[in-house]
Structures are given as structure tokens and as C-alpha cells.
């Protein structure tokens, strides 16, 4: 065979192999298409089938894997539907940890906001932590002087519950140095108070858009709850105060639908003082346990009906729950009048359980340190001192601060009642510690059907930071 014939033979064989390879690929593609086109009912391949029913309760997800079907029920919420929130509060035996953000510990080396007044509120699909930033980060020069409550740099922002208030995950909500927020089932509503002390303005946002305003009517630091507002069947309710912090002020209840104010009423409470109410839905009404910053060491109670009729008084229990306060043994309690004759105070909360009450308070009688929650038999309706349960959340060796209430809606929890939850703020820095800043983190607890052991879920940050040593 001459050289030309050898070249032709080798080329022919190579071309044949190429054609054969192409044919194999074509056959492989055809076989694959035919097998997949049969619907996968032979169970050879993994397959997920999602069936979306015309309900607001669930999506059924069926996963077929190696001839085995696994059915999961996934929470689903029709965003065009209002939450009900007319159910009763669940009766609980204790409170289990829900989340802890550890914001100050993380903030020593992370991009975490300087904050105060954190609170939690829930939609049908998630809970979020809201907080008032100081327009600055921990361990940064702009954190200097952030002990101040009101400034043009303060904003309301939020993250998913449990996340630190960091710059990467935080969502802007409103310009505010006082705020509240809640979800009606369709969208988030926020109320942010900002501006000068004598002419402050509260801007209502719905779905992230400004929809209404409330101007200061008494010209003396208009302010609101610093915790979740309350939505019932599409209408959202919150409480505002305007006037002195240490004597008679003026109080109003507001009602909004889709971010537009549709009603308001003045609360007549001569001799009593209401600030920073912690509110929650219960049996179709809004129940609030507030702060008396004037004289009382017992807490004001405000119960609001959908038509804005209200009942106002004090938490009856024969144990004080404000700080500072006197000895338990010397306190008698009252359902109608302030008791204890101690000025100042701290934001707190309580939950009605039939005629009983769960009431939170600092462990220290004189400072914002430690935190415990007590169940007092008949404490909602009588001046009872009978403690039937007590649970420690932060020990008295560690700082606490504000505390407040919220509930898990049935659409989120899957229960037939509203799960009572609370958060405890743990303030660090000025005025108690040698830093240039003031900030806080929080622990969040939710009611369960079991007793929960005492422990201390305190802040745990080691101070001072580098910025404090410069």
C-alpha cells in the first residue's frame, strides 16, 4: 500500500469514528427525551410535584424519591387576606427562648448598628425585630453620645427575628426616634415619630409608603409605644402620648386601615399616666399594659374595643412591676389608682390569662438589671399576691432594660389560639458603664405548655470596646 492509500485509509477510519460518535449522542438525546416525556411515573427519577389548592392554609408538596412519596405541608398565606387576630391568648405554663441577636458581641468586630428600643412583631409568615438606630455603628466614632434619646439621625429599621441589627440585612422602615409597627395580613404598617420636641410628627407608612401623619397636639414630645401595635381583621390600633413625663399628660388611641387613620379617641385618665404601652390582641380586643412615669409602680391597663370604646385603670395584682419600686410586702395594689409613689419607670408588659396575669419585671427594685416573669393568680382582676409561677430570664448580675409583648398569629403558629411572647432589651454602655456609647441587644421568649428552667440569657459583651480606649 503506497503512502497515499495509507493516508486515505486512516482518514476514512477517523471520519467513520466521528460519525459513529455523533450518532451515539443523537440516540442518547432521543432516549432521554422519550423517557422524560413519559411523565416520570415509573419512579426512576426524583420528582417534586407542587399542588396549590384554593385555600389560604397550605401548599401540599409531594416529593417522589426512589419510589417513596414524602408529603410536607408548607405554610401558605394569601397576601390579599387580612389576619383575624380575634382568638384568645393561649394559656401557657412557661416561656421558651425564641431568639437572641447578640448584636453587641457581634458588633465589636462587625458592622452592627447602635440601637435602642428593639421590639418584635409578626406577620402571617415571619417575625421581625424592629429597632431605633442612632445612625451609627458600634465601635465607631459616630457612636459617641448615643445615650441621647432624640436626634435627627435616628431611624426605625428591621431584620428577621434573631438576626443582629447589621447593615447588610437591615431594612429601612421610617425616620423615627419613637415608633411602633404591625402587620395586618397584607402589609406592614409602621408609625415613626420624628422632629423637634415641640412640633414632632408621626408618619404612618403602609407597605413602605407614607400614607398619613399625626402632628403633635400638646407640643411636648409626641411619642408612641416602642413595641408592636395590634391589627384585628384589617384595622390596626396604637396608643400615643403627648405631654409631660412626670405629671398629667394627654393620651390617644388611633385606628388605621391600610395605613389611613379612620378613627381616634382621647383617653380620659385624670391622676394617671400612660406611656410606652405594650399591647396584644385577646378575644377580639386590644389589651395594653403600659408605663406610669409619674407616680405609680403598678402599671396602667388599657383595654380597647374595635369601636374605640375603652376601659382604663391599673393592673390589679398586689405586686408592683415597674422600676424603681418598693418592697413586695409593702405594696397593696389597686385596679383603679397609681400605687407606690415612685417617679420614673421603665417600659414593661403583662398578659391576661383568664383572671390571672403573667407580668414581667426587673429583678432589681432600683435599677434596670435582671429580669423575671411571674404568674399571679387572679392578678388581672384582684389585688392578689399569690405567685403560682416564676421564671428568671436574665439574672440580677446583668443589665436588662425595656420589655414588651407581641403574639404569634394562628396563621403562623398553626395553633387555635394566640401564642403570647415577649422580648427583653439588655442595655449596655452609658450611663452604667464606661463607654462613649449606649446600645442594646435582646432575648425573645414565647409561651409553651411546659415549665421552663431559670437561666440567664444576658447580653454577654465584654466592654469597653476599642473606640472607648482612644
UniProtKB/Swiss-Prot annotation:
The active site is at 149 (proton donor/acceptor), 402 (nucleophile). It is a single-pass type II membrane protein. One of its GO terms (cellular component) is host cell plasma membrane. Residues 32-86 are annotated as: Hypervariable stalk region. Glycans are attached at residues 46, 54, 67, 84, 144, 293, 398. Residues 1-14 are intravirion. Inhibited by the neuraminidase inhibitors zanamivir (Relenza) and oseltamivir (Tamiflu). These drugs interfere with the release of progeny virus from infected cells and are effective against all influenza strains. Resistance to neuraminidase inhibitors is quite rare. N-glycosylated. Residues 89-470 are annotated as: Head of neuraminidase. One of its GO terms (molecular function) is metal ion binding. It holds the Pfam family Neur. InterPro entries: Glyco_hydro_34 (IPR001860), Sialidase_sf (IPR036278). Substrate binds at residues 116, 150, 275-276, 291, 368. Keywords: Calcium, Disulfide bond, Glycoprotein, Glycosidase, Host cell membrane, Host membrane, Hydrolase, Membrane, Metal-binding, Signal-anchor, Transmembrane, Transmembrane helix, Virion. Belongs to the glycosyl hydrolase 34 family. Catalyzes the removal of terminal sialic acid residues from viral and cellular glycoconjugates. Cleaves off the terminal sialic acids on the glycosylated HA during virus budding to facilitate virus release. Additionally helps virus spread through the circulation by further removing sialic acids from the cell surface. These cleavages prevent self-aggregation and ensure the efficient spread of the progeny virus from cell to cell. Otherwise, infection would be limited to one round of replication. Homotetramer. This is Neuraminidase. It comes from Influenza A virus (strain A/Duck/Chabarovsk/1610/1972 H3N8).
Amino acid at each position: 500500500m503506497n503512502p497515499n492509500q495509507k493516508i486515505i485509509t486512516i482518514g476514512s477510519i477517523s471520519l467513520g469514528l466521528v460519525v459513529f460518535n455523533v450518532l451515539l449522542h443523537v440516540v442518547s438525546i432521543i432516549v432521554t427525551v422519550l423517557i422524560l416525556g413519559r411523565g416520570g411515573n415509573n419512579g426512576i427519577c426524583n420528582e417534586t410535584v407542587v399542588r396549590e389548592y384554593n385555600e389560604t392554609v397550605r401548599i401540599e408538596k409531594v416529593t417522589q424519591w426512589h419510589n417513596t412519596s414524602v408529603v410536607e405541608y408548607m405554610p401558605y398565606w394569601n397576601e390579599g387576606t387580612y389576619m383575624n387576630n380575634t382568638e384568645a391568648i393561649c394559656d401557657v405554663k412557661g416561656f421558651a427562648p425564641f431568639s437572641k441577636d447578640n448584636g453587641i458581641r457581634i458588633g465589636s468586630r462587625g458592622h452592627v448598628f447602635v440601637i435602642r428600643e428593639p421590639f418584635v412583631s409578626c406577620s402571617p409568615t415571619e417575625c421581625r425585630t424592629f429597632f431605633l438606630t442612632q445612625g451609627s455603628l458600634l465601635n465607631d466614632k459616630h457612636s459617641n453620645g448615643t445615650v441621647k434619646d432624640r436626634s435627627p439621625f435616628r431611624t426605625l429599621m428591621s431584620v428577621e427575628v434573631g438576626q443582629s441589627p447589621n447593615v447588610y440585612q437591615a431594612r429601612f422602615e421610617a425616620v423615627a426616634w419613637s415608633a411602633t409597627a404591625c402587620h395586618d395580613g397584607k402589609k406592614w404598617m409602621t408609625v415613626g415619630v420624628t422632629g423637634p420636641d415641640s412640633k414632632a410628627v408621626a408618619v404612618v407608612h403602609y407597605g413602605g409608603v407614607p400614607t398619613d401623619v399625626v402632628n403633635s397636639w400638646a407640643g411636648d414630645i409626641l411619642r408612641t409605644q416602642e413595641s408592636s401595635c395590634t391589627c384585628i381583621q384589617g384595622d390596626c390600633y396604637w396608643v400615643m402620648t403627648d405631654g409631660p413625663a412626670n405629671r398629667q399628660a394627654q393620651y390617644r388611641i388611633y385606628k388605621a386601615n391600610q395605613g389611613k387613620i379612620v378613627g381616634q379617641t382621647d383617653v380620659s385618665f385624670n391622676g394617671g399616666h400612660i406611656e410606652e404601652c405594650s399591647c396584644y390582641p385577646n378575644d377580639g380586643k386590644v389589651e395594653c399594659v403600659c408605663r406610669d412615669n409619674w407616680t405609680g409602680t403598678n402599671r396602667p391597663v388599657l383595654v380597647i374595643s374595635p369601636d374605640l370604646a375603652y376601659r382604663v385603670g391599673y393592673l390589679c395584682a398586689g405586686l408592683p412591676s415597674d422600676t424603681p419600686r418598693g418592697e413586695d410586702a409593702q405594696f397593696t395594689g389597686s385596679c383603679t389608682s397609681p400605687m407606690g409613689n415612685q417617679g420614673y419607670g421603665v417600659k414593661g408588659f403583662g398578659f391576661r390569662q383568664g383572671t390571672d396575669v403573667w407580668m414581667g419585671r426587673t429583678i432589681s427594685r432600683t435599677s434596670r438589671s435582671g429580669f423575671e416573669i411571674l404568674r399571679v393568680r387572679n392578678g388581672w382582676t384582684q389585688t392578689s399576691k399569690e405567685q403560682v409561677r416564676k421564671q428568671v430570664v436574665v439574672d440580677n448580675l446583668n443589665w436588662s432594660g425595656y420589655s414588651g409583648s407581641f403574639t404569634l398569629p394562628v396563621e403562623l403558629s398553626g395553633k387555635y389560639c394566640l401564642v403570647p411572647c415577649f422580648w427583653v432589651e439588655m442595655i449596655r454602655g452609658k450611663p452604667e458603664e464606661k463607654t462613649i456609647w449606649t446600645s442594646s441587644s435582646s432575648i425573645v421568649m414565647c409561651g409553651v405548655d411546659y415549665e421552663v428552667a431559670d437561666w440567664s440569657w444576658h447580653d454577654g459583651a465584654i466592654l469597653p470596646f476599642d473606640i472607648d480606649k482612644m
